[in-house]
């Protein structure tokens, strides 16, 4: 849906924002879709209370909105990068993973988990955190990331890989349960 919106009705706004070194639509979409994804993952590991799932959703959404704040605080013509929003986002981003880890460790015998769970979860965790490293490279202006568009394309690929990975994890979790 997001990619349709930016390619058709919001294309001019999207391209104008990219020229300014900011993409608010990305961060709003991530705040929603990434939070849905982490909630689905949470459910797979036994988190079923509404307050627990709302907490995971909310703190994950805040993490993504801190990505938007990072962009707003650091326009392309800056002389110095303010990393505050980025590193507060790391803290917020790890909280849902810590909660999932607690549930995973309380599962009991991890050998009873389906074969795909631990490798899939590890890969998804890696991809999830590559978003933050992409932002570091982009705002530190390292190599190809000096060009905002390169970082933007990296976000698109990471999003595709992350969503596909989680879709397979959820699908396998449903089919094999």
Language model features by range: what are they?
Residues 1-25, 34-177:
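Polytopic alpha-helical membrane-helix bundles and their juxtamembrane interface segments
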């Amino acid at each position: 849906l997001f990619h349709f919106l930016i390619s058709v009705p919001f294309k001019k706004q999207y391209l104008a924002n990219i020229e300014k070194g900011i993409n608010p639509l990305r961060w709003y979409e991530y705040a929603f879709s990434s939070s849905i994804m982490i909630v689905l993952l949470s459910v797979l590991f036994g988190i079923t209370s509404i307050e627990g799932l709302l907490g995971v959703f909310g703190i994950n959404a805040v993490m993504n909105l801190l990505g938007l704040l990072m962009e707003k605080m650091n326009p392309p013509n800056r002389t110095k990068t303010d990393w505050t929003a980025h590193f507060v986002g790391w803290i917020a981003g790890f909280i849902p993973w810590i909660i999932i880890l607690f549930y995973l460790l309380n599962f009991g015998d991890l050998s009873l988990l389906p074969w795909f769970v631990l490798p899939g979860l590890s890969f998804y965790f890696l991809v999830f955190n590559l978003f933050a490293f992409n932002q570091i490279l982009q705002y530190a202006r390292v190599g190809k990331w000096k060009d905002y568009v390169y970082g933007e394309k990296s976000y698109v690929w990471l999003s595709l890989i992350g969503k596909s990975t989680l879709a397979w994890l959820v699908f396998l979790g449903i089919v094999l349960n």
